[in-house]
Every structure is written in C-alpha cells, then in structure tokens.
C-alpha cells in the first residue's frame, strides 16, 4: 500500500467490537473445553475488524471469512497479517454458509457474526457509488463482478416497480413522486451518476420534508442498494442457515442498522426461540421445544462514548442467541 494511503485498520472501526467478542466468547470457550478446535463464521468479513478481535483473543480459533467484496477481502488479509493464517476466506454471500463450511471442511461451527449492510470502506470509496454526498458512477454493487448495478435498475425498471422498491426497501413516503421523476428524467437522458439521481430525487421531494427527514435521497439510495445486492432476501435465507449450522452451545450475533434488517432478524430468532407445541398440550415433546435462547433483552446498542468516536455506529442494533438443542427438521 502507498505510504500516503491509510492502513485498513485505520479506516475501519468495528462497531461494538468488545461486546460482540464477549457475546461469542462462551461458545468458543465451550468448544475448547470439549476438546475441539473452535470454528467461527464471520459472514460479513469486511475489513476484518471483528475477526481480528476474535483471533487475537482466542489463539486456537479458526474463522471462515465470507464476503462478496473481493476488495474488502484483500484488505482484511492485509489488516490481519499473520492472523490471516487462521482465516479461511470464501468469496460469496453469507446465505451460502453451507458451501463455505464445506469448502473449509467443517460440518458445524461454534460462533457466528453477521454485521449487516454497507461497510464504511464501501461508502468511502467514491467509485462504488453508494453515497449520495458526492458525484460518482451510479453503481452500488457490493460484488463488482455482478451484472446488475443501480444504474441498470434506474434505467430498466418501470415506474410501478421502482415505486415498489423505493417504498418497500427504503420506507420512503414519497416513493410515488420519486419513481415518476426518475422515469421522466431518464427519458431525457440516462441517469448514470449519483449526482444526477440526487437532483432527480430533490425535484420530487417537498423542500419541507428535507428539513425534518434528513437528506432527501437517503431512503431511495438505501432502497436501490438493497435491491441491487438482494440484501433482505440473502438475510432471510442466511439466519436459519447459520442457526442450523451451529453446534449446541454455539452462538450467533446479528448486527443490523435499519428496521428492515432488524425485523427479519427478530422474526427468525423469535421463531427459533419459541415452542412449536400446540397451546394447551399437557406435555411438550422435545421436537417442539425452542432451539435457541435469546441472550439480549430486545436489542443492544452502542454506548454514547462509542457513537461519539464513530458516528456510523449510532444506528447499530445487536441481537444474539445461543443454540440449546439440535435443530428442528422443519426449521
């Protein structure tokens, strides 16, 4: 890396790092006490901050590091240095955890972390087109080998589908006017940059809304990013996949940054933590008993001190569970 370039560890502050490690630590320790080499899954390796903390604390731990962003994986390897010898990288999305585990030669894991959403590195890399704060190509692909970019969606989707995505994935109340404005604007010239898209969105959102609801493009950019990367569909498949993959005693931590992510996470964790026995049954059979127990009361959030040091941590919410028996065959 050039001398003028910041190191990966200087550019990325892992959110709630110590709390994440503390939540996963008992599962790693239990594996050691059982006489096996503990294995964790970092389903969203990013720049490796959480994995670095886990590997540093547990010298015998191995981590399967999953990420669809090859650039981030390379920077994680640089950051981890000699610790990288205990990381088994997997290029792909984290719903493919069974494939990643098979490639690593393991059938069960002891701990797992999903740190959701877009990373600081991706937001700060202007050429990736994730941010509305500066002009850049309208891309938003977490995996730059994927075919479909945000510019593709903006160019090809009809008004009804654009409105649906912006409303569903961005929770944007002005989804209709924004979708209409996009269709009108692209008829005049292609919308290929973030700056042009911001202008189009501004033209559709009442000025008064921007005074109280933050940047007028925030929710539309979120919606397009989620749609381009199929983030919610992947999360929906990934939570049950990793719960099934955990050893009994294994733990999962999920860190979300907006209500859509947290809603999906909560739905799955609550279902796995709830008995499936019909109400009023005098005896609850084992197959109906909860598979996990919830470790967090609702969600846990960063401290004010951490938020003051890393403003991007402000919206983080953590949920965690421990697997207490083998998975239901229908889970």
From Swiss-Prot:
GO terms for molecular function: rRNA (cytosine-N4-)-methyltransferase activity. InterPro entries: RsmH, SAM-dep_MeTrfase_MraW_recog, SAM-dependent_MTases_sf. It is found in: Cytoplasm. Residues 298-312 have a biased composition (Basic and acidic residues). Residues 297-331 are annotated as: Disordered. Belongs to the methyltransferase superfamily. RsmH family. HAMAP family: 16SrRNA_methyltr_H (MF_01007). NCBIfam families: 16S rRNA (cytosine(1402)-N(4))-methyltransferase RsmH. Specifically methylates the N4 position of cytidine in position 1402 (C1402) of 16S rRNA. This is Ribosomal RNA small subunit methyltransferase H. It comes from Micrococcus luteus (strain ATCC 4698 / DSM 20030 / JCM 1464 / CCM 169 / CCUG 5858 / IAM 1056 / NBRC 3333 / NCIMB 9278 / NCTC 2665 / VKM Ac-2230). The gene is rsmH.
């Amino acid at each position: 890396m050039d001398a003028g370039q910041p190191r990966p560890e200087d550019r990325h502050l892992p959110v709630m790092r110590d709390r994440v490690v503390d939540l996963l630590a008992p599962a790693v320790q239990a594996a050691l006490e059982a006489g096996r080499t503990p294995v964790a899954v970092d389903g969203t390796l990013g720049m490796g901050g959480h994995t670095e903390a886990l590997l540093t604390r547990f010298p015998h731990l191995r981590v399967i590091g999953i990420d669809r962003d090859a650039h981030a994986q390379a920077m994680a390897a640089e950051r981890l240095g000699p610790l990288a010898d205990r990381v088994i990288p997997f290029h792909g999305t984290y719903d493919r955890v069974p494939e990643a585990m098979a490639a690593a030669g393991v059938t069960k894991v002891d701990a797992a972390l999903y740190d959701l959403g877009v990373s600081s590195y991706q937001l700060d890399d202007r050429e990736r087109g994730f941010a509305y704060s500066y002009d850049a190509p309208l891309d938003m692909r977490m995996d730059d080998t994927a075919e479909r970019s945000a510019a593709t969606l903006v160019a090809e989707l009809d008004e009804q589908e654009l409105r649906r995505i912006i409303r569903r994935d961005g929770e944007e109340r002005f989804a209709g006017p924004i979708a209409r404005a996009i269709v009108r604007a692209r008829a005049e010239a292609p919308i290929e940059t973030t700056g042009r898209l911001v202008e189009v969105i501004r033209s559709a959102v009442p000025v008064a809304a921007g005074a109280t609801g933050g940047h007028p493009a925030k929710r539309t950019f979120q919606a397009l990013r989620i749609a381009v990367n199929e983030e919610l569909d992947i999360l929906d498949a990934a939570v049950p996949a990793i719960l099934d993959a955990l050893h009994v005693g294994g733990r999962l931590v999920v860190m979300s940054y907006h209500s859509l992510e947290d809603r999906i996470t909560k739905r799955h964790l609550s279902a796995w933590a709830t008995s499936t026995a019909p109400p009023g049954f005098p005896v609850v059979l084992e197959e109906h008993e909860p598979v996990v127990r919830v470790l967090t009361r609702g969600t846990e959030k960063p401290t004010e001190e951490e938020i003051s040091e890393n403003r991007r941590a402000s919206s983080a919410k953590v949920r965690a569970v421990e697997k207490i028996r083998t998975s239901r065959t229908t889970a």
